[in-house]
Amino acid sequence: MDGCKKELPRLQEPEEDEDCYILNVQSSSDDTSGSSVARRAPKRQASCILNVQSRSGDTSGSSVARRAPKRQASSVVVIDSDSDEECHTHEEKKAKLLEINSDDESPECCHVKPAIQEPPIVISDDDNDDDNGNDLEVPDDNSDDSEAPDDNSDDSEAPDDNSDDSEAPDDNSDDSEAPDDNSDDSDVPDDNSDDSSDDNSDDSSDDNSDDSDVPDDKSDDSDVPDDSSDDSDVPDDSSDDSEAPDDSSDDSEAPDDSSDDSEAPDDSSDDSEAPDDSSDDSEASDDSSDDSEASDDSSDDSEAPDDKSDDSDVPEDKSDDSDVPDDNSDDLEVPVPAEDLCNEGQIASDEEELVEAAAAVSQHDSSDDAGEQDLGENLSKPPSDPEANPEVSERKLPTEEEPAPVVEQSGKRKSKTKTIVEPPRKRQTKTKNIVEPPRKRQTKTKNIVEPLRKRKAKTKNVSVTPGHKKRGPSKKKPGAAKVEKRKTRTPKCKVPGCFLQDLEKSKKYSGKNLKRNKDELVQRIYDLFNRSVCDKKLPEKLRIGWNNKMVKTAGLCSTGEMWYPKWRRFAKIQIGLKVCDSADRIRDTLIHEMCHAASWLIDGIHDSHGDAWKYYARKSNRIHPELPRVTRCHNYKINYKVHYECTGCKTRIGCYTKSLDTSRFICAKCKGSLVMVPLTQKDGTRIVPHV
């Protein structure tokens, strides 16, 4: 195979003015896969694409996609041969093509599909399709041909540092199963890549061309839609290899951040089974190139995931499932074989055992990634997976049957809990003891209620209302006794020579003696008050007179100023004889009027019963506590000699003389006639007039 590939001459590009036939010759041996050769036809001439595939043993051919000229129709002719022999020259290939079309049918008449209406589709039968079922296996930015290598191309099995094998993509190249973000090809479309013979030509289609198996950005794949591009299996950031994506490329089942994979997206790049730090290959990835069976020093095994790579089954936030069609997708008939890949990641096979020997990456990183792969696989597994059921049964085992040591620990714990539960029981007993006193209190309250019932029964028997009975003498007597004691316990005056207390009881100032000794009584009260309350600021002698005309007024204080012989204030006090007919009334009235005189003579204030008067009134009560409180008005009961009574309302009107004419005056309340009540003495005997 290698010799055959080396001896193949490089195809010559036809001139643009002539019609040309482009032959794609694929040869494969055991456990190898050929690569597709694509040529760009002239833009203004009709072109024919010939795809010659030869297979032997377990080999897989690749599909050939050609971009038809923009203004003319193109045709694609596919030649499949099962023999291992291949044509080495351009003339032999053309002759073989003419022999096949011996029925006088020109190549242009076979399988003619206008490119303007719909992209041509080339169907190639391969015995062993790839995991993602893609015919074309190796596109390269520099267009590497598996049989006719270019100056910049590498051998199918011997990759160079900058070259990619038929199964190993370059850094800028994408697998046939992983389309670029800006272009979608089921095999390999690239925005900047051209045909396998031309450095700038694409293997299947240009920016506006569509591959035979994969539509362009504006075309929809049969299975997998993408936001910007649709790939049959996997989109790539820049380009995708047939089986192994590079740093920027994704595997057949691993989409990039912006691309949607059929089942598993990756943050940077995802491999179907083993992602690499810089590149992911379905079987073996290398830093610069990936070989189909031998991985480089920086390459990882198909089962060894990288730190930055995720499993093929782990979905990404921006990735879409292969079964979900895009808005621009049309075909929904061909599903992606994602379950096969998941089963390969879960079930160990002989190939995985061989690959594990080649995995030299650290076990810690691989174990971490393996955990992520298991998560992805479990998500993609169907509900009838045989491996998922044993895990559920194992989880149920500890609940159904507990081991002996666990039972012992639970028994110990139960015993501990019993000891812990005991104190609350004691507390409950304590609380019961606490609850008992309220019950006793309830009984006490019942005892208290019973006397009330007895009292109610008593009130029923007594004709007196229960309100009066409640106000029984037993309650009033102590209070009344206390009040009487307070009255009897009048404080004594500390002023020496004070005689104001019990003045009305003295014989000297009572009865007929009061009329003879009333002037002496008034002068003694004035001197005592001037000395104790006013601090002798009042004059020694003050005019205090008697007024017999004031019928209801007890006293009167007249204040003013005198300008002759010199300016001075003066005050004059008058006491009504008809109201003040006892020694105690003369005393209280005189003290009241002396407060007015002191406020004017000492302070020079005319405020009637204002603050100055109140000051002296409070001071007099403070110094002489035995005196009654000095107030503004008196409440004395006037002793009239003559009373007139209304015949209607029985109201009485007092008079000192019999001067009221009952024929002229009537009662003010009821307008009834007035009648004079006969005079009586103090003992109640009637006084008979002497006239």
From Swiss-Prot:
It comes from the Eukaryota. The keyword Nucleus applies. Expressed in germ cells of the testis (at protein level). Detected in skeletal muscle, liver, kidney, pancreas, heart, lung and brain. Expressed throughout spermatogenesis, from spermatogonia to elongated spermatids, in normal adult testis (at protein level). A motif (SUMO interaction motif 1 (SIM)) lies at residues 22-25, 76-79, 97-100, 121-124. GO terms for molecular function: SUMO polymer binding. The keyword Nucleus applies. This is Germ cell nuclear acidic protein. SUMO interaction motif 1 (SIM) mediates the binding to polysumoylated substrates. Residues 27-36 have a biased composition (Low complexity). Residues 467-488 have a biased composition (Basic residues). It comes from Homo sapiens. Residues 124-333 have a biased composition (Acidic residues). May play a role in DNA-protein cross-links (DPCs) clearance through a SUMO-dependent recruitment to sites of DPCs, ensuring the genomic stability by protecting germ cells and early embryos from various sources of damage. Can resolve the topoisomerase II (TOP2A) DPCs. The gene is GCNA.
